[in-house]
C-alpha cells in the first residue's frame, strides 16, 4: 500500500516553474503485482541493446534487432524462458513482436554500446548477469555467449588503454 501511495503521489506531483507553470516531474515509480515485471527488460536488453556491440564497431538498436530478426527472437524468447524458469509468468513480458516494432525506430546504438565505444572501463553487465543466471539453470545460447564475449573484449581493451 505504501508503494502504491508513493506511485500516486509522484504521478500527481508538479514542479512550479516561473516560466512554464506546473511541470510534470521526469520521475516515475511503477508498482507491479509481479516481482518479475522488471526482469522483462532483460529480454529487450539482450536482443537489442547488448547486440549493438560488435567486434569492430557499434550498430544501432534497430539494426541489432532487425538485421537478423530470427536470431533476435531466439535471444528474446530464450531470455524470457530463463525468467519464467525463475518463476515469472509469460504475462509479465512484452511480446517479441511489440518489442521489435518499437526497436525499429531506435536509430542509435544503446547507451552501453556508446559507452564502450567512448572508452568506458566499466558498464552495467546485464548480459553477463543473464548468462550466469542461465548457466545456473544449465542453459546456454551461443548468440548470448558471443555477445558476452564481445562486450568483455571491449572492456578489456578499454581497461588496457
Residue spans for each PLM region:
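Flavin (primarily FAD) cofactor-binding/catalytic cores of flavoenzymes
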Residues: 1
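NAD(P)-dependent Rossmann-like dehydrogenase/reductase catalytic/cofactor-binding core
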Residues: 4-161
Amino acid at each position: 500500500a505504501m508503494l502504491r501511495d508513493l506511485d500516486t503521489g509522484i504521478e500527481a506531483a508538479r514542479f512550479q516553474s516561473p516560466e512554464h507553470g506546473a511541470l510534470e516531474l521526469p520521475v516515475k515509480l511503477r508498482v507491479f503485482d509481479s516481482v518479475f515485471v522488471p526482469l522483462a527488460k532483460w529480454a529487450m536488453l539482450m536482443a537489442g541493446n547488448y547486440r549493438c556491440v560488435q567486434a569492430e564497431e557499434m550498430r544501432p538498436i534497430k539494426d541489432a534487432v532487425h538485421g537478423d530478426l530470427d536470431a533476435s527472437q531466439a535471444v528474446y524468447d530464450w531470455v524470457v524462458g530463463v525468467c519464467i524458469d525463475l518463476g515469472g509468468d509469460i504475462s509479465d513480458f512484452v511480446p517479441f513482436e511489440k518489442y521489435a516494432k518499437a526497436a525499429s525506430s531506435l536509430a542509435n546504438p544503446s547507451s552501453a554500446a556508446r559507452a564502450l565505444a567512448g572508452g568506458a572501463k566499466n558498464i552495467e553487465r546485464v548480459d553477463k548477469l543473464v548468462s550466469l543466471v542461465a548457466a545456473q539453470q544449465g542453459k546456454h545460447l551461443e548468440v548470448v555467449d558471443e555477445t558476452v564475449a564481445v562486450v568483455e573484449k571491449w572492456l578489456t581493451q578499454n581497461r588496457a588503454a
